[in-house]
Amino acid sequence: MKMKRWLASAVLPFVFLAAAAEATPHVPLHVYEWVQSSARANYFFNKRVTHYGLTAEGVLNPRVLIVPTLQTYDDVAIADVVAKRRWRGESLAGYDDLVGEAEYLRIDLAAGTSTLERADDLDSTWSSITTTFPKNVTVIKDLPEKSLERKFLEAVLAYERGHRMEIAAQTKKTLTTDDLKRMEEHEREDLTASLLGGSAQASEEKAQKDHGAKADRKGGK
C-alpha cells in the first residue's frame, strides 16, 4: 500500500505554510501524538492507527503493538539525507521534495523488542519516495536511557498502558469474548510496566504533560 493512500485513508490533513525552504509542517495532534523534538527533527506516532496484533485465528494479541510513526525534518536534516544518498550512489529522484520519514514499528511486549518493519521517505504530498524493509530488531532495555530512540519507545509504551481498550477498539470493530479475555490477561500481566522499569506512571504523566505543553504552544497559550 502506498504511503499516500495510507495517510489519506486515515484522514490525516497536513498543511504546509510558506515556501518549502521555510515551511514548518503542521501535524494534527488529535491524530498524531508528539513525543519529542531534536535539533533537526520532530517525532510523532499515529495514535489513531496504532493497534494490537492478531493471532492466526483472528483473536486479539495485545502482546504485539503495531505503531506507525512520523518524523518531520528541517532543511539541515534533509540536506544530510540527500548527501548520504549521493555518497552511496543511490537515486536522488524525488529527494528535492523530501520532508520526512514514516516508519512502522512492531513492538513485542513479551520479548521487549521493537522491529522496524518498514520505512518510507516522504515528499510534500506525503507520497513515498523510497520504501525499505529493514527488519532491524532493537532490544528496548539495551538502548541508552537518554537516547532519543529509548525515550520515544518509552513514550509509546506509556501511551499503550493508558489507552488499552481504545487501541483494542482500533484493532477490531467488534471485540469478541476471546478478545476481551486476552485484554484482561494483558492487564494482569502488565508487560508494559516491566519494560518501563517500574516507572510507567511517571512516564505516562510526563507524556501527557509534554502533550499538553505542545498543544498550548500550538494554540498560542
List each model region and its residues.
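Bacterial N-terminal signal peptides that target proteins for export
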Residues: 1-10
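N-terminal secretory-pathway/extracellular module detecting exported/lumenal segments
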Residues: 23-103, 108-221
